[in-house]
Structure formats: structure tokens, C-alpha cells
């Protein structure tokens, strides 16, 4: 059972480094704030100057389309001065450390820094070296808190609740920060979580996560309300985990016959980027009745607007 949710007046944390740092009041506060931005983002005038005079710096050390553009749009719609650094042309390429970069940026007095980094814990290190708030946009395979928050908002928007739902997360769990953040948040909000993956893509410590584990996808999808697919994180794999993409699709790709084991109204989710024909069938990805993948992107802007506003205050 989920703990009773009470509305929070103020966030309990200075930084957003991970879901595990948040209380259920913090989560509810962020989601309620995000809901207030949904209609604004659908209107003709999308600008709300609540962060006028504030400076937001985006540091993305890994490639990103959805998260980086979402944070940039979010900041601009709130009226902040947004600087997205091109890390390929930064002093990092000349050997500068993250700590020295942090000290340099801190001297410019930003109000908030958004960071994505390939190393787990990099955002925590940055938060210790700057005076402003730090938002984690994904650090290694550790956490991706705003993705979990936007996924939760998407589920609530469609299902009106999370508590009592059965959610399947299928794919490369070992290397997925999205999986970890979603597991933490879904457990907090009272969902039952099924993890589906080949045994060699299942974390060794998975038993500690409070989830059900399956290597058989059809069994794992049985009576699920939500099916969340994840891509293979080939860039984080140090050795070959699979014989071929074709074999992976046969056993772990979401197809109509596998989806039939979930509930008839089960929703399909994916954080992106998608690899069609590997972890998901194209027709299912584009199914207007069941796929909420585009809605995840849309609500992601609202969630990130909420996070920027809350943590800048």
C-alpha cells in the first residue's frame, strides 16, 4: 500500500539527484505543479515568466534529443536565460575535470544546472561543488529522476491512479537508469512492478528492489496495466550480451501476440530512443489507442518546467 499523500508546501531537497532522495510529498508536489503546465504548453502563448532573471545551464556529456530539448524548452517557457553548453567544444576535451568545470560555472552564479553524464554519481559530485541547485538528467546507469516523474504523470493522466496497477518493465534492466528510477517511484506510489529481461540483463541485486522478476515475457506481461519497453544500452555493454538483435526481438520484443497476455486496455510506454523491430513492433509503437509514447514526450516538458520552477525557488 502507498503511504497517504499530503500536499507539500515546499520541496525537501535542494537538488534533484534521484527518486530515492524524494519523499512522497515531494513527488506529489512536483506532479501537481507539472499538471498546471499541461494546458499552458498546449496554448498559443506558452511563455510564463516566473523564472525571469534566473540562469539555467545545461551540461550534457552524453547524446540526448528528448531530455535536452525538453529541459531547454522548459526553461525558456518559464522565462529563464538558458545556456546549453556544447561539450564537444568545451575545455573538458582539453583535459579539464568535472570539478574544475563546476568551479568555473559556479563563479558565473547560475541559479540551476542540469547535467547528464556517463558516470554514475557525477551529478552528486557536481552538487557538492556549486552553490546552485543541480538537476540530474541521467547519470550512468544510476538514475534518471525526471523520466520516472514524467512516466508517472503519463500513467496518472490516462489511468487516474498508480496505486494498485501492475506495471511491466521489459528490456535491458542492468544498464538502465530509467528502470531504476521507475522502480523506486512506482514502488513508492503503490504499483506492483514486474521486471522482464534475459538473465544476463537482470541486475544481480534485483531482489532488493521489491519487484517480481521474469525471464519469460508472456508470463511477465500477464494482466499488466502498463507495458514499459526499454532499449538495449549497447554503449554501456563491455561484452556481448546477446547473440543477435533478431533473437532478442523473438523473445523480448513487444509484439501483438505477446501484448495479448497483458490487459486489453494496457498502455505501451517507451522512454526513447526506440529501436523499432528490436524491442518493439512498429505497429504497436504507433498504435493510437494504446501507445502513449508521444504523450510521454509532451508531459516531459511540463514535468521539467515544474522541476525547474520548484528547485529554482
Curated annotation (Swiss-Prot):
GO terms for biological process: 'de novo' pyrimidine nucleobase biosynthetic process; 'de novo' UMP biosynthetic process; amino acid metabolic process. GO terms for cellular component: cytosol. Keywords: Pyrimidine biosynthesis, Transferase. L-aspartate binds at residues 94, 177, 231. HAMAP family: Asp_carb_tr (MF_00001). Belongs to the aspartate/ornithine carbamoyltransferase superfamily. ATCase family. Heterododecamer (2C3:3R2) of six catalytic PyrB chains organized as two trimers (C3), and six regulatory PyrI chains organized as three dimers (R2). This is Aspartate carbamoyltransferase catalytic subunit. It comes from Pelagibacter ubique (strain HTCC1062). The lineage of its organism: Bacteria, Pseudomonadati, Pseudomonadota, Alphaproteobacteria, Candidatus Pelagibacterales. The gene is pyrB.
Amino acid at each position: 500500500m502507498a503511504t497517504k499523500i499530503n500536499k507539500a508546501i515546499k520541496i525537501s531537497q535542494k537538488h534533484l539527484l534521484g527518486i530515492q532522495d524524494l519523499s512522497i510529498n515531494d513527488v506529489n508536489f512536483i506532479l501537481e505543479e507539472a499538471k498546471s503546465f499541461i494546458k499552458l504548453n498546449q496554448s498559443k502563448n506558452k511563455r510564463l515568466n516566473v523564472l525571469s532573471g534566473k540562469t539555467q545551464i545545461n551540461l550534457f556529456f552524453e547524446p540526448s534529443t528528448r531530455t535536452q530539448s525538453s529541459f531547454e524548452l522548459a526553461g525558456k517557457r518559464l522565462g529563464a536565460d538558458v545556456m546549453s553548453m556544447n561539450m564537444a567544444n568545451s575545455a573538458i576535451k582539453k583535459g579539464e575535470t568535472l570539478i574544475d568545470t563546476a568551479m568555473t560555472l559556479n563563479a558565473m552564479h547560475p541559479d540551476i544546472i542540469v547535467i547528464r553524464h556517463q558516470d554514475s554519481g557525477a551529478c552528486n559530485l557536481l552538487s557538492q561543488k556549486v552553490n546552485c541547485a543541480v538537476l540530474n538528467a541521467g547519470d550512468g546507469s544510476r538514475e534518471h529522476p525526471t523520466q520516472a516523474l514524467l512516466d508517472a504523470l503519463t500513467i496518472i493522466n490516462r489511468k487516474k491512479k498508480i496505486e494498485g496497477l501492475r506495471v511491466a518493465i521489459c528490456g535491458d534492466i542492468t544498464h538502465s537508469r530509467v528502470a531504476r528510477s521507475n522502480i523506486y517511484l512506482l514502488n513508492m506510489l503503490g504499483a506492483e512492478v514486474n521486471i522482464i529481461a534475459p538473465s544476463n540483463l537482470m541486475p544481480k541485486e534485483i531482489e532488493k528492489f521489491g519487484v517480481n522478476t521474469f525471464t519469460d515475457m508472456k508470463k511477465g506481461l500477464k494482466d499488466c496495466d502498463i507495458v514499459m519497453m526499454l532499449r538495449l544500452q549497447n554503449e554501456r555493454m563491455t561484452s556481448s550480451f546477446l547473440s543477435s538483435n533478431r533473437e532478442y526481438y523473438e523473445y523480448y520484443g513487444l509484439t501483438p501476440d505477446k501484448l495479448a497476455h497483458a490487459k486489453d486496455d494496457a498502455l505501451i510506454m517507451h522512454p526513447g530512443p526506440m529501436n523499432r523491430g528490436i524491442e518493439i513492433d512498429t505497429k504497436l509503437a504507433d498504435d493510437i489507442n494504446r501507445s502513449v509514447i508521444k504523450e510521454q514526450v509532451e508531459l516531459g516538458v511540463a514535468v521539467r518546467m515544474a522541476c525547474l520552477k520548484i528547485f529554482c525557488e
